[in-house]
Amino acid sequence: DTDRSRGLGDVYKRQVFVDIHDEQAVEAAINEKTRVIFAETIGNPKLDVVDIEKLAETAHKHNLPLVMDNTVATAYLVRPIEKGADIVVNSTSKYINANSDAISGVITDSGAFRWDKEKYPGMAEYAKFGKFAFTAKLRNGLFRNTGACLSPQTAFYNLLGMETLGLRMERACDNAKKLAEFLNTYPDVTVN
């Protein structure tokens, strides 16, 4: 059985885009069909930073998992699960890899979200795996159907990049701070 229902098609049928910083807009967009709240830790391309704790509070109030894309920040700068996110995704091809010589990604499940069988019927058969239910669903459906399996060479490239991740992220932060301080001296440059 490799139909769409085995992947995440049963979860991601329709996307609604809202200003993730506008609490009222987020609340207004949530209805009985909403299944997940997805946001980027640091948005691309605006580089805006989301309040993960506030977003997690909103998601959990409505019994929704909060999925954070942490590609730009990486776990070196921000650990979304510690701030209330349920699932974190990263494109490792960017900062983690360092050289963009391999295409891959990582999904990290906190195991904290309790999948309601009524709201998420596709998760019912995975309830027996407890906190690993979402991971089991990914493995049985998405990974099996799309061939999402990291090759040894790609893993090697990612590990090489991780050796310098800390240094690179510190330098990026230092450079960003210096640039912001420099631009702050120009009255024609404003931050909205």
Q: Where are these predicted regions, by residue range?
A:
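Active-site core of PLP-dependent enzymes with the aminotransferase class I/II
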Residues: 28, 42-65, 73-79
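Buried hydrophobic positions in well-ordered alpha/beta secondary-structure cores of metabolic enzymes
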Residues: 37-40, 55, 69, 80, ...
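Gly/Ser-rich phosphate-binding catalytic loop and adjacent alpha/beta segment
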Residues: 6, 15-29, 41, 46-49
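Active-site C-terminal subdomain of aminotransferase-like
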Residues: 87-90, 95-192
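Hydrophobic beta-strand scaffold residues
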Residues: 15, 66-67, 88
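Single conserved hydrophobic/aromatic residue that forms the stacking wall/gate
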Residues: 1-12
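Short acidic/histidine-rich motifs immediately flanking catalytic phosphotransfer sites
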Residues: 30-37
